[in-house]
Amino acid sequence: MSTEEKFEAFKQGLIDKNEKKYGAEVRKRWGDTIADASNEKMKGLTKSEWQHRDEIEKELKAELIAAVKEGNATGTHALHAAQLHAEYLCLSWPDGLYSAEAHRGLAHAYLADERFKSYYDAWIPGATEVLVDAIDHLLSESAD
């Protein structure tokens, strides 16, 4: 198997895992068209785009941990985490789907569903709530 074939298999494996864990909820909330388009976008990412996505996630994690430790959902670390989260979504979602409303809706879904909440809270307890508050604050500032 070539390096490219391994990379494609790796992406497909992650898409399948994500579909199994979150697919029903995503399809219920946003529909098959958006779910399928998001999966296709992920399949189409190049190695460098995938690496960039991973780098964003690592930086998001570091900033969110710092924000929780700082205890400030509107501080520099938290707001940078919210910005990184938006950038991550733009790399993962179909082109043109991102909006402040969609970002805020997804963030609040994280709090409502333990599967989503546990992803960020595994980094540090309270991370999901800080991220959601930071996203709300960032998007409110942007609307002003």
Briefly describe each language-model feature range.
Residues M1-D144:
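Amphipathic alpha-helical "stalk" segments
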